[in-house]
């Protein structure tokens, strides 16, 4: 049996999707979390980041891209820009890729940080702490950044996305396994996500419990 590691919260910054996304006129322009610098600041300079989120790997969770003139979100390394799962085209591309591997005999997927794919935004699509956002960010910590985890882990559309994945990728297939790495998920939510009746994932592993 072969269970593949699946990383779809983010891609490499060398991925063709990201390279295309640097062009605001490209069809991939909205495939990542791009944001302008804060008003009244100089793009690329400290303090111009869209909000005060810190990366899990240290420093800001935002990296300035001169080619596009905007920042992109990376919860981990700046080499790993976060995909925008709010975009149906992103989800379609992910599901097509998963089907491609299953059609070639893979037996399932171990999904890297899959519970970070849904970000919490306000009614205008703005993230907490962004200029003009209806959502307040958390206070900054000792390193000068706030914690994005409460707004990115186990987000509002996560169940919807995982159930859609189940239908689009696994419906009609037998003998497959889905295992999700689930940062920020409570034991109670674990039960919901792995309940067969909810059609999401078979198993989760949580480092917090």
Name what the model sees in each region.
Residues 1-99, 103, 116-185:
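Acidic/aromatic-lined carbohydrate-recognition and catalytic surfaces
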Residues 109-111:
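Hydrophobic residues within beta-strands of alpha/beta enzymes
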């Amino acid at each position: 049996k072969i269970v593949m590691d699946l990383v779809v919260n983010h891609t490499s910054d060398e991925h063709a999707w990201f390279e295309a996304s640097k062009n605001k006129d490209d069809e991939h322009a909205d495939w990542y979390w791009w944001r302008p610098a804060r008003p009244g600041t100089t793009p690329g300079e400290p303090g111009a980041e869209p909000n005060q989120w810190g990366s899990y790997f240290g420093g800001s969770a935002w990296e300035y891209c001169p080619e596009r003139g905007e920042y992109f979100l990376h919860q981990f390394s700046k080499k790993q820009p976060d995909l925008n799962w709010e975009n149906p085209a992103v989800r379609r591309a992910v599901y097509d890729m998963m089907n491609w591997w299953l059609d070639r005999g893979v037996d399932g997927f171990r999904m890297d940080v899959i519970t970070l794919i849904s970000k919490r935004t306000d009614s205008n699509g703005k993230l907490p702490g962004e200029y003009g956002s209806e959502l307040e960010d958390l206070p900054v910590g000792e390193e000068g950044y706030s914690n994005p985890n409460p707004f990115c882990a186990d987000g509002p559309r996560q169940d919807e996305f995982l159930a859609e994945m189940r239908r689009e990728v696994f419906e009609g297939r037998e003998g497959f396994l889905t295992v999700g790495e689930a940062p920020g998920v409570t034991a109670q939510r674990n039960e919901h996500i792995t309940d067969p009746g909810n059609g999401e994932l078979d198993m989760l592993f949580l480092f917090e419990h």
